[in-house]
Amino acid sequence: MAFLADALSRVKPSATIAVSQKARELKAKGRDVIGLGAGEPDFDTPDNIKKAAIDAIDRGETKYTPVSGIPELREAIAKKFKRENNLDYTAAQTIVGTGGKQILFNAFMATLNPGDEVVIPAPYWVSYPEMVALCGGTPVFVPTRQENNFKLKAEDLDRAITPKTKWFVFNSPSNPSGAAYSHEELKALTDVLMKHPHVWVLTDDMYEHLTYGDFRFATPVEVEPGLYERTLTMNGVSKAYAMTGWRIGYAAGPLHLIKAMDMIQGQQTSGAASIAQWAAVEALNGPQDFIGRNKEIFQGRRDLVVSMLNQAKGISCPTPEGAFYVYPSCAGLIGKTAPSGKVIETDEDFVSELLETEGVAVVHGSAFGLGPNFRISYATSEALLEEACRRIQRFCAACR
């Protein structure tokens, strides 16, 4: 009898975590490595949020909390959805988890049965299909195209839906591509979803506040209120407020789904860390100027990286609307010989050779379900980004 569960055979380790770990190992050995694999802001958590956590400690807010979150945070979440997304939820329709990942996992665990399908546009965040598989479902991938800026077309979504489809997973702005959908682009997708009343929508809005220029963020149920009773809208404080380590995600949706997720979480982790929840209350209710300042910084970094990558031989990099990633194509390098003498046959070969030759760590696109591409996180200083892009240019020029 095997000791480990059969379910593990359906799951792969996280490629993004693996890249960051590899970069750390090389740095520990003395290598000059620039790591561009991390999916977190390089800013510190704002002082007012840290102070709220310290105040909570001083007040003795160190006990177990209700499974779905402290009332103050659930009220703040409901107000946030009304204020920023024009969505009406009661506090009872919200839930707080230990990061957005737990929210998503609990939603799948609460709803998926063997044979249920989950439609996921590619490229996708690496954890979506793995969570679906762990929960007994079947991921169904729908490739997007670079010429469409990696945005799903309505007709492709329509073709992917079957009687077995239970969820459509929607992420805008996207990890890994940075693609963000306009109101009009979203309306085309929601029109399709209205034709299929058995399909639920799981929307990952974690990068909501990281859009650039005049782009206006919208979320599916805001665009099509008819989806309200079958949409779970997930968000969190990690990206917008530089709070990745605090591990607070949240969602709002139909009460019966929230109750089911609460039941699972109650037998899993119970409530998220009390101090982190009080910090999240301040993040949502307190001053929001931190977000605007950081958007300007990220936009400058994005423009720098896109410009420099498009000067590299064999690289094509579209300009994303949001998040802090770019997703360039390395198709022009496939079939070329790297400085080491190895022929680059895949995007995985490209990123491996780039790391060994130039010490730049990025994530191969095949990990996100669409290649030959690679993901760069520009959540680091302009000086490091400029140096990394120079190294990429040098590597590409040396390929023959």
From Swiss-Prot:
A GO cellular component annotation in the UniProt record: cytoplasm
Pfam annotation, one family: Aminotran_1_2
Location in or out of the cell: Cytoplasm
Major localization class: cytoplasm
Site feature: Important for prephenate aminotransferase activity: 12
Subunit note: Homodimer.
Top-rank lineage group of the source organism: Bacteria
Modified residues (N6-(pyridoxal phosphate)lysine): 239
Organism, as annotated: Rhizobium meliloti (strain 1021)
Catalytic function, reaction form: L-aspartate + 2-oxoglutarate = oxaloacetate + L-glutamate; L-arogenate + 2-oxoglutarate = prephenate + L-glutamate
The keyword Phosphoprotein is assigned to this record: no
Free-text function comment from the UniProt entry: Catalyzes the reversible conversion of aspartate and 2-oxoglutarate to glutamate and oxaloacetate. Can also transaminate prephenate in the presence of glutamate. Required for symbiotic nitrogen fixation.
InterPro entries from the UniProt entry: Aminotransferase_I/II_large, AspAT/PAT-like, NHTrfase_class1_PyrdxlP-BS, PyrdxlP-dep_Trfase, PyrdxlP-dep_Trfase_major, PyrdxlP-dep_Trfase_small
Named cofactor requirement(s): pyridoxal 5'-phosphate
CDD domains tied to this protein: AAT_like
Keywords tagged on the record: Aminotransferase, Cytoplasm, Pyridoxal phosphate, Transferase
Protein name: Aspartate/prephenate aminotransferase
Binding site for L-aspartate: 39, 125, 175, 375
Biological process terms in GO annotation: amino acid metabolic process; biosynthetic process
Phenotype when the gene is knocked out: Mutant is unable to grow on aspartate but can grow on other carbon and nitrogen sources. Mutant is unable to fix nitrogen within nodules formed on alfalfa.
Enzyme Commission number(s): 2.6.1.1, 2.6.1.79
